[in-house]
Design a protein with these regions (language model features):
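Active-site rim helix/loop that mediates acceptor-substrate recognition in acyltransferases
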Residues: 30-84, 200-228
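Conserved active-site alpha-helix within GNAT-family acetyltransferase domains
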Residues: 123-127, 133-153, 294-311
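Conserved GNAT acetyl-CoA-binding A-motif
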Residues: 114, 119-133, 283-294
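Intrinsically disordered, low-complexity, positively biased terminal segments
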Residues: 2-24, 38, 85, 169-430
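Conserved acetyl-CoA-binding loop-helix of GNAT-fold acetyltransferases
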Residues: 95-122, 268-280
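Glycine-rich phosphate/pyrophosphate-binding loop shared by adenosine-nucleotide-utilizing enzymes
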Residues: 63-74, 93, 236-241, 259
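Hydrophobic, small-residue-rich alpha-helical packing segments that form membrane-like cores
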Residues: 15-24, 30, 43, 58, ...
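GNAT/GCN5-related N-acetyltransferase fold signature
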Residues: 58, 77, 100, 231, ...
Length: 430
């Protein structure tokens, strides 16, 4: 189901799905919103992503001198699967391409597009929605909470002493360079094998692989042909890959090249150890930069001197989550401790509001149902979304006065039920 046409909140501005013929106008509005020049290759990229009913535009019918309404705000969504604790794929609505031209701000256009899309997502059966926020303070009012951060590292290779010797690796393994064709052919299957192991991960559509292979252009995406390496075990099974670039930089007669890790997938710890050891052994490299790792990543602990690893400047919140169907979402994930907790949830849209009892069992299953029992915790749906994937801390939210503890110790109990040993991580923008 798409999004039905509807008059926008500002008189003379109509919010509706765009037609295929309006792609160029929609992309022009998006470029203005992101403060980039509009160029034809961007429209080619939108062609790959076009899905009837899922690209919304706000059209100004009163544009001076225009022979047709002009697009002044953009919004796109698509369906994907979000890996939740335990490995299940939760059906979610992924939101992207959200802009409002600076000439049309404060007119309710974002609110109109967002509420239309979220309502349609609930009807389609999406249990949650996700997005990446350009600014921290925009999306909380729509029920989104920061659920998956990024935490990268910048490592001085000489000071680090490299990766420690003796780390476990697969006996007889090998690492080989791969062509772009091999990357595009074998990478998708490897990613699909890895994705169920990592809460917070999402699918990579065909367009994602084509973009990373340099087959299509996208303004704002700084594609540079890098190096792809595959890791195989002794029997030839592909268990990992890394994609990286190396900048040609010298300090006089001495190489001072930074190596930037753009993609890293390992199905097990042995594969990861071997790939990191390889990356830290590349000739002429002075710094290894890994900007898009997950929180608590072990990279510094793999080094002879962990102090050589400095937090990357892009470390920040990344994926935001908005719960739409609490029973479906909480039944899909797994839990690491049994227990019961009653939550009083507020939701401006009313979709998830009410008193809910979360019950988890020793076998890892759980459910959430309506109840009239007294609440242990009071919180809004955005804060619940930040806890859902197992990476947030209810105790920290309580200390920051971002939720209300009605029963002493309830925040710690919430962490016992909801937090997971494996932190959520999503390496992919969308």
């Amino acid at each position: 189901m798409g999004n039905d046409a509807q008059q926008g909140p500002d008189r003379g501005i109509e919010i509706r799905p765009i037609t295929h013929e309006e792609l160029a106008d929609w992309d022009r509005a998006l470029a203005l919103g992101f403060m980039r020049p509009h160029v034809p290759p961007a429209t080619e990229w939108r062609e790959l992503l076009f899905e009837p009913g899922r690209m919304l535009g706000a059209f100004d019918h009163g544009f001076p001198g225009a022979d047709r309404p002009r697009c002044v705000a953009t919004f796109r969504s698509f369906d994907t699967g979000l890996t939740v604790p335990g490995g299940e794929r939760l059906p979610v609505d992924a939101i992207t391409g959200v802009t409002v031209n600076s000439t049309h701000r404060r007119r309710g256009l974002l609110s109109g597009m967002m509420r239309r899309d979220l309502a349609a997502a609930r009807e389609r059966g999406s249990a949650a929605a996700i997005l990446i926020a350009a600014e921290h303070n925009i999306y909380g009012r729509f029920g989104f909470g920061s659920a998956v951060p990024l935490a990268g590292w910048r490592v001085d290779v000489l000071r680090s002493g490299g990766v420690r010797a003796g780390l476990p690796v697969h006996a007889g393994h090998r690492i080989d360079f791969a062509t772009l064709e091999e990357f595009g052919k074998l990478g998708p299957d490897l990613h699909e094998r890895w994705r169920p192991t990592q809460p917070g991960a999402i699918g990579r559509p065909d367009a994602w692989w084509r973009l990373r292979a340099g087959e299509v252009d996208l303004p704002g995406f700084d594609w540079k042909q890098g190096f792809n390496v595959f890791h195989r075990t002794a029997d030839g099974t592909l268990t990992g890959m890394a994609n990286y670039t190396v900048d040609d930089k010298w300090d006089g007669a001495y190489p001072d090249c930074p190596l930037t890790v753009r993609d890293f997938i390992a199905l097990d710890r042995e594969t990861a150890n071997a790939l990191w050891a390889f990356l830290f052994s590349v000739d002429w490299v002075r710094h290894v930069v890994a900007p898009h790792l997950g929180p608590g990543h072990v990279l510094p602990l793999l080094l002879n001197d962990p102090r050589a690893a400095k937090p990357h400047e892009e470390t920040a919140d990344f994926t935001w989550l908005r719960l739409l169907d609490l029973p479906a979402a909480f039944a899909a994930r797994r839990y690491e401790a049994p227990g019961r907790l009653v939550l009083d949830v507020t939701d401006r849209e009313g979709w998830t509001a009410g008193r809910w009892a979360l019950e988890t069992a020793a076998d890892g299953t759980g459910r959430i149902t309506h109840t009239d029992d007294p609440a242990d915790l009071g919180l809004d749906v955005a804060r619940l979304g930040s806890l859902y994937l197992g990476g947030g801390s209810a105790a920290a939210l309580a200390d920051a006065a971002l939720l209300t503890e009605h029963t002493p110790g309830a925040a710690v109990r919430a962490d016992t039920l909801l937090r997971t040993a494996r932190a959520p991580w999503n390496p992919d923008g969308f």
